[in-house]
UniProtKB/Swiss-Prot annotation:
GO terms for molecular function: ATP binding; tRNA dimethylallyltransferase activity. NCBIfam families: miaA (TIGR00174). This is tRNA dimethylallyltransferase. The gene is miaA. One of its GO terms (biological process) is tRNA modification. It comes from Rhizobium johnstonii (strain DSM 114642 / LMG 32736 / 3841) (Rhizobium leguminosarum bv. viciae). Keywords: ATP-binding, Magnesium, Nucleotide-binding, Transferase, tRNA processing. The keyword Transferase applies. Substrate binds at T17, A18, S19, G20, K21, S22. It comes from the Bacteria. Monomer. Catalyzes the transfer of a dimethylallyl group onto the adenine at position 37 in tRNAs that read codons beginning with uridine, leading to the formation of N6-(dimethylallyl)adenosine (i(6)A). Its EC number is 2.5.1.75. ATP binds at G15, P16, T17, A18, S19, G20, K21, S22.
Length: 297
């Protein structure tokens, strides 16, 4: 078994949903005595294994997988939290002689992993919860107006309906008395040196990708996605919770309420996935430079 630890510090694999990147990660991890590390912001949650395409035990093929399903559904989990988890994990992988193989479709995770993350301040949980509660109860308009008084330049740069970003800007201003823009220009430490990593972006043919997406969403319903969403609803998650925004949740909720047929769920769920994949493809083409290998799987 070949081990690349002496020549590269990690393998990074990204690409759109349903591109085959997870299978590629397992293949490379088996070849190079590696361990797969999740870099997908939805697959961190302990719910929706099927709907977020979290690898099954069979798909893992005995390869160690890390940072999958380790976050409670209702918990806040940021790019910074992911980086902290990665930083805590890497020494153990190194000690075990395992090459980290990062795989996922969250481009910001890879940018932060190789370029550092803005050094944002810690926010008191009581303040964060207070602002989130206001967002749920009042909507974003009043919070945006409040931000416009406290930080006019930042308020002007944000979409008035982007509640999460408005809350983030407000909580930083309230906690520190300074604009979030003051912190965004400061980067934290780089965890993976991009120059010493093998970097792969999987960009399949569009027609092939769409065919995979259509088939996969139907398979998800067959494998229990409906039961997953029913269990999620039983947790009484707020609508703003990130896990509630996973692709397919809103369509399946509509079906459970009798507002959509199974056929409509398949059609609309697959369409939403195709739109998401298109946004991912555009982002990767624009953000991943020539040092990233382009592969079709």
């Amino acid at each position: 078994m070949e081990n690349l630890l002496s020549t590269v510090n990690a393998i990074l694999i990204t690409g759109p949903t349903a591109s085959g990147k997870s299978a590629l990660a397992v293949e490379l991890a088996k070849r190079h005595d590696g361990a797969v590390v999740n870099a997908d912001s939805m697959q961190v949650y302990d719910t929706l294994r099927v709907l977020t395409a979290r690898p099954s035990k069979e798909e893992m093929q005995g390869v160690p997988h890390h940072l999958y399903g380790h976050v409670p559904a209702g918990a806040a989990y940021s790019t910074g939290a992911w980086l902290r988890d990665v930083s805590a994990l890497l020494p153990a992988l190194r000690d075990a002689g395992r090459l980290p193989v990062f795989v996922g479709g969250t481009g910001l995770y890879f940018k932060a992993l190789t370029g550092g993350l803005s050094d944002m301040p810690e926010i008191p949980e009581t303040l964060r919860e207070k602002l989130r509660t206001r967002l749920l109860q009042e909507g974003p308009d009043g919070l945006h107006a409040e931000l416009a008084v406290a930080d006019p330049a930042m308020a002007a740069s944000l979409n008035r309906q982007d509640g999460q970003r408005i809350v983030r800007a407000l909580e930083v201003m309230k906690a520190t008395g300074r604009s979030i823009a003051d912190f965004q220009g400061r980067s934290g430490p780089v965890i993976i040196d991009a120059a010493e990593a093998r970097k792969i972006v999987v960009l399949p043919d569009r027609a092939v990708l769409h065919q995979r997406i259509n088939g996969r969403f139907e398979k998800m319903l067959q494998q229990g996605a409906e039961d997953e969403v029913r269990a999620l609803l039983a947790l009484d998650m707020p609508a703003e919770a990130p896990v509630m925004k996973a692709i397919g949740v809103s369509q399946i909720v509509a079906m459970l309420r009798g507002e959509m047929t199974r056929g409509e769920v398949l059609e609309k769920g697959a369409a939403a996935t195709r739109q998401y994949a298109k946004r991912q493809m555009t982002w990767f083409r624009n953000q991943m430079d020539d040092s990233w290998e382009r592969l079709t799987v």
